[in-house]
Amino acid sequence: MGRRFKILAFTFFIILPAEQRTLSQQVDSTSFKINPRFSFYSFESAGEILLIVPQNLFYSKLTVSFGIDGEVIGSWTGIPGKKMARIPVTLNLQPSEYILNATIAVSGRNVKYAANTHLIILKYKPNEVKTDRLTGGLIVNKRQFFPFGFYTYSPVHPTLPEEEVVKGFNMISPYQRILPETLTSRKAYMDRCAQLGMKVHYNLLSVSGGGGVGSLIDGLDNQSKKEWLINEIITFRDHPALLAWYIADEPTGNKISPDSLTRIYNLVKELDPWHPVSTVFMAPFMSSRKYADALDIVMADPYPVPVSPISMVGDAAGQLAAEFAGRKPVWIVPQAFGGGEWWEREPSLQELRSMTYQSIIKGARGIQYFVRQGLNLFPKSTAAWAECGRMAAEIAELTPWLLSDEETIPVRSGSQNIIITSALHDGQLVIMAVNKANSPQRADFSIARSFSGKARVLFENRSVSVNGGYFSDQLSAFGSQVYMISMKKENRTLEPWTKNLIKDPGFEDVSSPGVPASCYARSGGDRGATYFLDPREHYEGNHSIRIITPAENKSVRLRFFPFNGRNGGSYYISIWAKADPEQGLQSGEENRKHYFEIALGDYAYTRFELTSEWKEYVTNVTIPYYNDQPPRTNIILQMPSAGVAWFDMLQASESVDIYKCINPELKQ
């Protein structure tokens, strides 16, 4: 079904000083721009409008009132102080597409400013994907999402998704031709990705805007192409693995006009307004401006190695991020191939790291490498691809900061070869730095706030000293570093038991990015079952363990670091957990239960049913008095039901001391 929206007026009412309310006021409709923060709203009761302010008015006072059909829904008065002002609004609106009008008054100026855009309200769907125009990120399953994946070729090898998801990749984009006879194979990889929690950047090139590898279908007339496009969108628009529609590859190089691509875009959005549409651009990348009405996500594919400096990649990301700020997310396609055509060699693992981090530091909020064909075809270097997987885990760890909407604390670098950015999230400042040079560099950093203490060097299990806001470090050739500084004292949601027997109970040890430190893992029968740390969901601290079980009774089993048990002793075990029933291949099944099991060694286990909210689960296990097992024992966690769940703050204590254990206020 297509979108059928009633067009309604959504007006900003501006209160002007009496002396400025004259009939002779000039109207300027070009200086200010407005955009809803999200590409659409669905379940939210409140939203934000982004007001793009001209530079000469950054420090002018604006007075604004918001209303729909005369009803005021919000107001704002203030000095923006920067390019973008965030203005909250109430969204008590029915699904529709609204024309959003704005008039902006500037104190001391007898000029009325006007702007307009569209505000889209849709009925909520579990697989919907929003773009966040403020952060450049995505909202997937109601959570922040930083896409980090790769192109691949068709047919998709059956084991490819599971081989890559365990590294930390969360997205794939297969080149494919949309032929009726290959529909079964497309559905197969989509279903497998949904089981694994991977998303698919779905390639429609062969029946949409063209371009790309092997996308041409000989003899296909325009009418058939349109019919096949419509059928493909209808087939997969409700699929839980769908992330976005990819409709054109390098349109300038393939002589696809902006008008023709806009017509395709409008058709796709009419059929599926719940998912964004993307296009990839070749150099010159700023040609993408002409296609702004034909896409939701701007992508660029700079391939510099070995002829051009790799700073070309960061430069492209920075230019596009500046151009489309507040409007469109920017993704970069780093080069992960070489040795043929026009590219004499593929990038080294160091070059891949620098290109990737340059892109992200300069504003890219999606990474899609070109190209992956396993196990050692593209790229040929398994070490280079392992580095890409390592970065996938690192960026997953940094997602709350990269997609933070908090005002950051600026940080400067003392070297022109080192580019940096900073982000603030929940009182913790993250500083990302990357070396553009193929030689080691001393890095001197200054924070725009006086601070003395320690900065943790993430992913290296060390720290550096910060004195008065200044610190130094060494960056390897084309290397990157990430530093974290706690700017305020942590407010703990939950105090751990004083006699807790579990090491790293809150899963905060990130010595190896993405994986819990103090446990072993055992397969339950599916190689794609995962158990990553997730900084987006946690009951306390900064992390939980996210377990994804692809199919029933094929969960990974986590065996936590052992402790000494006592024959005849009883042990209380506690863990916090939640599930998301809307995710996974079977997400549409009504009344489907999610459950997990927790055990103490081989003595006993308890099964619990999960809910969609954080909840504490407690059990008690007694070790038999007459027992010939070794004294050391483990807590074992698994989730036999297919789906996704998060686990936090695992605790165990012998029940003889339980009152002292669970109340930190009680003394020995």
Predicted regions and their residues:
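Aromatic-lined carbohydrate-recognition surfaces of secreted/lumenal glycan-active proteins
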Residues: N203-L205, I264-S287, A325-G339
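Carbohydrate-binding surface patches
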Residues: G414-S450, F478
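Active-site groove signature of glycoside hydrolases
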Residues: W228-P258, M282-S288, D293-P304
